[in-house]
């Protein structure tokens, strides 16, 4: 899918390294810079791919995800906002509406090291169908040798949220994640609380855990691709580790049957309590990703 995105015809060349393209229903922004290749969907301000020069793709994007208006994309970094997980009210979308609506590209800049982009979503008739509040939501990205993502919400409200990052791995059987802390809520086991005794999370089957006292940096150890990915979390309360395992992967229409083998989600999350935004002090959630060969 990522190769397909970069082979799409250019609709508008915004700068020498930034272009607008289209895949089915969705407008895309493609970064082709000497230091980095990346791509975004305007729907959801959704980072689809990020590849620093000399590295394998860092993010995972499903080959089966539809690029359709209003349908959440499977992979990359979905922005879950203004709620994380199932909606409190029946009939509303899981993980909020921000990932399903078109955002505006408000600013972009570039230098020798990479590209900076700012996307904006504002309250509208479309958002008030889901949520009554007035808001301005900004998503800032800095892509280069590292990837920096910051979500900033302006208004008067309480939210839960996540940067639901899907990371590309060689084989989930050979992946370990450290730095998660010890206590977690196990969503595969009736939301019971558990303890990670050795501080290392592996993924032998379906895994869905909300870590309650995570360290600032989660480290993905990938023995197959022979690299580590550092995921540094900012302004967060939790980290989520997720992999659907084989049975759920088969049941998901937007994922290949064996899709679970080649990704792990390590998510920057504010979920176990609400996060307050005020007019004076916007709420924030941020993630910095670095990759290194072992």
UniProtKB/Swiss-Prot annotation:
Pfam families: Aldose_epim. GO terms for cellular component: cytoplasm. This is Putative glucose-6-phosphate 1-epimerase. The active site is at 164, 267. The keyword Isomerase applies. The keyword Isomerase applies. Keywords: Isomerase. Gene3D superfamilies: 2.70.98.10. Probably functions as a hexose-6-phosphate 1-epimerase. Substrate binds at residues 74, 99, 208. SUPFAM superfamilies: Galactose mutarotase-like (SSF74650). Its EC number is 5.1.3.15. The lineage of its organism: Bacteria, Pseudomonadati, Pseudomonadota, Gammaproteobacteria, Enterobacterales. It comes from Salmonella typhimurium (strain LT2 / SGSC1412 / ATCC 700720). It catalyses: alpha-D-glucose 6-phosphate = beta-D-glucose 6-phosphate. Monomer in solution. GO terms for biological process: carbohydrate metabolic process. Belongs to the glucose-6-phosphate 1-epimerase family. InterPro entries: Aldose_1/G6P_1-epimerase, G6P_1-epimerase, Gal_mutarotase_sf_dom, GH-type_carb-bd.
């Amino acid at each position: 899918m990522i190769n397909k995105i970069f082979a799409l015809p250019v609709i508008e060349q915004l700068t020498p390294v930034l272009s607008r393209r289209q895949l089915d229903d969705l407008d895309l922004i493609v970064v082709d810079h000497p230091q980095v290749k990346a791509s975004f969907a305007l729907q959801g301000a959704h980072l689809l791919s990020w590849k620093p020069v000399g590295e394998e793709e860092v993010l995972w994007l499903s080959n089966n995800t539809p690029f359709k208006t209003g349908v959440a994309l499977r992979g990359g970094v979905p922005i879950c906002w203004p709620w994380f997980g199932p909606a409190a009210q029946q009939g509303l979308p899981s993980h909020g509406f921000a990932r399903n609506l078109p955002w505006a590209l408000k600013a972009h800049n570039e230098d020798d090291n990479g590209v900076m982009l700012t996307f904006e979503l504002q309250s509208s008739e479309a958002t008030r169908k889901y949520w009554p509040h007035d808001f301005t939501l900004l998503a800032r990205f800095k892509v280069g040798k590292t990837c920096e993502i910051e979500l900033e919400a302006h208004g008067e409200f309480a939210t839960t949220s996540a940067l639901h990052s899907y990371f590309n791995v060689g084989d989930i059987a050979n992946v370990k994640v450290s730095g998660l802390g010890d206590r977690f809520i196990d969503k595969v086991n009736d939301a019971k609380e558990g303890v990670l005794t050795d501080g290392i999370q592996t993924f032998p089957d379906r895994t869905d855990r909300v870590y309650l006292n995570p360290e600032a940096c989660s480290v993905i150890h990938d023995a197959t691709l022979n690299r580590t990915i550092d995921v540094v979390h900012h302004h967060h309360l939790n980290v989520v580790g997720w992999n659907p395992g084989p049975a759920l992967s088969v049941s998901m229409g937007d994922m290949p049957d064996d899709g679970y083998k080649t990704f792990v989600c390590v998510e920057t999350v504010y979920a176990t309590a609400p996060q307050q935004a005020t007019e004076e002090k916007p709420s924030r959630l941020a993630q910095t990703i670095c990759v290194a060969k072992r």
